[in-house]
Amino acid sequence: MINLAVFFGGENCEHDISIITGLQFISKVNEYLYNIVPVYIDKNGDWFTGKDLNDIDNYPDNLGKLYKVGLVNNCNTLFYVKNKRIKKYINIDVAVLCLHGINGEDG
């Protein structure tokens, strides 16, 4: 199965519309072909993933248990920190940017 990361949110005034864009995209992806990895970027620029990201009713304050994740340059793997150590979360095969505005659709 292909791991598909969908990035949404962001550090700008279009943060909320980007969440809607990301969730709309996710709702149309064939889950039999792709393992969807939602990656939410909060207004501080921190990245998170977790199942609670798939429900719009959880935004912005009810995101439950999320993993704070990040990428390493020239690597297609999301990592998280546990007990002060970097741990592998998942390899990303394809990434889709559903970001709007500065630090998003500007590249």
Where are these regions (language model features)?
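ATP-binding N-terminal substructure of ATP-dependent carboxylate-amine bond-forming enzymes
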Residues: 1-107
